[in-house]
Amino acid sequence: MKAKKISALLLAAAMTACAVPAQGAAADEPKVPKYIFLFIGDGMSYPQVQTTNYYLNAIEDDGDDILTSESKLNMMKFPVAGSAQTYDSTSFCPDSASTATSISTGHKTYSGTINMDEKMETSYETIAEKLKKQLGYKGGILSSVNLNHATPAFYAHQASRNNYYEIGQELIASNFDYFAGGGLKKTTGS
């Protein structure tokens, strides 16, 4: 029940972020978002974002104090932003697999597990799968690391993040529309 509420909240937040009307548009006209983006900065949190903003303000050298400068990262200008508690079932310091599961499904799981329950028997439906199935959205993954790595493997349902070959097989069967990234790891299954 709690997981369903979290999934619904994540979906609502994603849709709200993209549905904010453009300037001049009537506020009472509902708009369906054309695109929904979910950015995951692996290991990133508010201190990293704020430090990057301070750094960029410092190198701009506009004479303003970096702590009071009005200049902001583009991602800090979004009208709606959210965060999630991505600790997992077993650890306060989780890994990429369980945090990706928390973000994509609203469920907690064991470290090292991608989109499956703690017994590693039941697959969780991801927000990307729901958006595609229920609303007809296209889905894609863009990554700077291999596409069968735990974080970009949003499409997979595996008991172990180290099942690179099986994760790659799920990529093919995922029905996602676009993939781009750092290749695949262990493509032969050996």
Question: Could you say what each language-model-derived stretch is?
Answer:
Residues 18-29:
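Sec-dependent signal peptide cleavage junction
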Residues 11, 15-19:
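Hydrophobic core
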Residues 1-10:
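Bacterial N-terminal signal peptides that target proteins for export
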